[in-house]
Amino acid sequence: MKMKKCPKCGRYTLKDFCSECNEKSVTVKPPRFSPVDKYGKYRRALKKAKM
């Protein structure tokens, strides 16, 4: 089983069709890995603020 996401409402599901809007769900792809992390500064600041 793969996790899927509804493109219309953004809800995550394991089914082929969304239970909320009956739209066909699509496979979720992880973000591409890059050694140059464009958003690392923001993630670290957010993590530090939560501590």
From Swiss-Prot:
The keyword Iron-sulfur does not apply. Involved in ribosome biogenesis; more specifically in 18S rRNA pseudouridylation and in cleavage of pre-rRNA. The gene is nop10. Keywords: Ribonucleoprotein, Ribosome biogenesis, rRNA processing. InterPro entries: H/ACA_rnp_Nop10, H/ACA_rnp_Nop10_sf, Nop10_arc-typ. The keyword rRNA processing applies. Disulfide bonds: none annotated. It comes from the Archaea. It comes from Methanococcus maripaludis (strain C5 / ATCC BAA-1333). GO terms for cellular component: ribonucleoprotein complex. Belongs to the NOP10 family. One of its GO terms (biological process) is rRNA processing. This is Ribosome biogenesis protein Nop10. One of its GO terms (molecular function) is snoRNA binding.
